[in-house]
Amino acid sequence: MIPHKKNDSSFLSVPVSRVGSTQRLNQLASHGVATGSPNAYSSIPSTPSAYVSSSLNPTKGISAGPESSNQIITKEDRDAFGKLSIVEKVNEFEQNLTNLSFKVSSFKEDELASLIGKLIELNDIICSEIGELKKHRDLGILIKGLKDDQAHLDNTSKIILKELITYRNELKKLPRLPSNKNKASVFPSPNDSKVDVNEVLKYASKLSKFTKAPPTVSNLPFQIHPNNYVWPAEDALRRGMLAMSSIKVDDIINAELGEDTLEVKEEAIKKVEDNKVESITNSPPAERRGSFGERTGESRKQESQGALDLDLFDPDEEDFSD
């Protein structure tokens, strides 16, 4: 009968654990106390109660609070984060490191050199990618600031549009001024303020039942109408005309006589006066008056003939009168 051979525990390897040294010693001490023998030692440590997050975990240190708005929240964000080149390299590095630790723990020497070479290569790539992370971080901060500015501008533009809509509604309620087509000024000119007579008549017809005196009242010329009628009374019109004529006497006289006739008369008077002045200035000088004894008989005859001519009949005057 072959005797039972006891396994030598000295040749068993201890797998690599991520538990800290102090926590591991505490676990070993508690395990020895629980078995009751200080020499009862097991090379395989117990599984830790709490999961220790790896340094290569991409979601390590991510808080789900409202302050982490630009971090991984949804499944789509996690998938997009996993497709990044640096994350893929980190995952590949972790997988190769796990394979290397397993082969070392199981004393398998095959492919150890290739795994170590891959780890070195991946380490160099990750170091170069880490240098690019700073640029991506700065760009992310810039994008976040631009998004905040865009949100602020959107809110401001919405407030401005709401105020403009309220102002437009208030302006619609105000009465409109007549449009000035000739000038680009906002204020209306005096010519634009003229109202058509037909529009005034329509407005007056809306205010009163009659636009003129009814026939029953117009047939009574001697009746005194009260002042509260829509149409004016005859005595009121007469008083108004007399008052206007007493105020503007000169204007009425000029309108009756005509300004043209007065100007013609003034021009005729000026011409007559000018002719008199010219005749006086252009007349020859008067002859020297002789003495009483110097008169001849011829001059006496001419005077006597002139006196006789005054009493004679002149046929030219008769023809002119005809």
From Swiss-Prot:
Component of the Mediator complex. Residues 311-322 have a biased composition (Acidic residues). Belongs to the Mediator complex subunit 4 family. Residues 286-303 have a biased composition (Basic and acidic residues). One of its GO terms (molecular function) is transcription coregulator activity. It is found in: Nucleus. It comes from the Eukaryota. InterPro entries: Mediator_Med4. Keywords: Activator, Nucleus, Transcription, Transcription regulation. GO terms for biological process: regulation of transcription by RNA polymerase II. Pfam families: Med4. It comes from Debaryomyces hansenii (strain ATCC 36239 / CBS 767 / BCRC 21394 / JCM 1990 / NBRC 0083 / IGC 2968) (Yeast). Component of the Mediator complex, a coactivator involved in the regulated transcription of nearly all RNA polymerase II-dependent genes. Mediator functions as a bridge to convey information from gene-specific regulatory proteins to the basal RNA polymerase II transcription machinery. Mediator is recruited to promoters by direct interactions with regulatory proteins and serves as a scaffold for the assembly of a functional preinitiation complex with RNA polymerase II and the general transcription factors. Its main location: nucleus. GO terms for cellular component: core mediator complex; mediator complex. Residues 274-322 are annotated as: Disordered. This is Mediator of RNA polymerase II transcription subunit 4.
